């Protein structure tokens, strides 16, 4: 079982990391090609392209300018500990034991606009480049054109290496769109999390993102190896709904919103 999640805009390059092991991103050559384009953009270009403040645009222009290889623990950080958004609050990587981190290295992947696909211990440097960014590049008008079937190829290799053909999609639509579903050598299962609001079950973005991280952690800690095992997920008040689920979508409902 292979799990894919989205990255996060917020980063943490300060906290102490509980592991010393690291690996190099598999798609770094592609990243360096993208960086050639990114380095040509001024802060004003980035502000317009990414719809971000001048301050953030300047920060990211500096990040692009300072990007350097080879990656080492001194100039980069393991991906699972570098991202700091709602998904990663749920995942809580810092509290995973060493055996679970090793398991995650084989069974968890992080989609990325700049790095394509990252393993948990792959080193990365700080960046902001969302997958939906319309960044013109030698391959086309946006990042989907750039990555084309590259990410899917690497996912297929990972599926083959870890022994089955089940891919658990815990990524956002923006990021999972970078996966060529027809070319994927596996069955895609998408968990969906709904909270009760005003008497109706709805996807509430903040809660759904955190729940994706909780689900990823659950799979890793419990070494879940089949879809039936996913149905036992009951963390943070979520309960599997057979009625609302299908063969490719597993729906979890929660009656009371958590803090």
UniProtKB/Swiss-Prot annotation:
InterPro entries referenced in this protein's UniProt entry, alphabetically: YaaA (IPR005583)
Disulfide cysteine pairs (residue numbers): none
Stated name of the protein: UPF0246 protein MADE_1015435
GO CC annotation terms, alphabetical: cytosol
Entry's transmembrane regions: none
Gene Ontology biological-process annotations: response to hydroperoxide
Family, similarity comment: Belongs to the UPF0246 family.
């Amino acid at each position: 079982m292979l799990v894919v999640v989205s990255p996060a805009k917020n980063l943490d390059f300060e906290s102490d990391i509980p592991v010393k092991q690291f690996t190099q991103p598999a798609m770094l050559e592609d990243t360096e090609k993208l960086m050639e384009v990114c380095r040509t953009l001024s802060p004003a270009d980035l502000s317009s392209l990414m719809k971000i403040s001048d301050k953030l645009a300047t920060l990211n222009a500096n990040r692009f300018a300072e990007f350097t290889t080879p990656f080492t623990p001194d100039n980069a950080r393991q991906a699972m500990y570098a991202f700091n958004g709602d998904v990663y609050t749920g995942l809580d990587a810092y509290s995973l034991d060493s055996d679970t981190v090793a398991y995650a290295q084989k069974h968890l992947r992080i989609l990325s606009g700049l790095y394509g696909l990252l393993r948990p211990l792959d080193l990365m440097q700080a960046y902001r480049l969302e997958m939906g960014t319309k960044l013109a590049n030698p391959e086309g008008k946006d990042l989907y054109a750039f990555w084309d079937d590259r990410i899917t190829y690497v996912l297929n290799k990972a599926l083959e290496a870890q022994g089955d053909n089940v891919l658990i999609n815990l990524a956002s639509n923006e990021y999972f769109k970078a996966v060529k579903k027809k070319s994927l050598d596996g069955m895609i299962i998408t968990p969906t999390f709904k909270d009760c609001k005003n008497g109706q079950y709805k996807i509430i973005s903040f809660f759904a993102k955190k729940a994706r991280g909780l689900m990823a952690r659950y799979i890793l800690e419990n070494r879940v190896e089949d879809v039936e095992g996913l149905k036992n997920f009951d963390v943070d008040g979520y309960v599997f709904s057979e009625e609302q689920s299908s063969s490719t979508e597993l729906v979890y409902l929660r009656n009371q919103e958590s803090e």
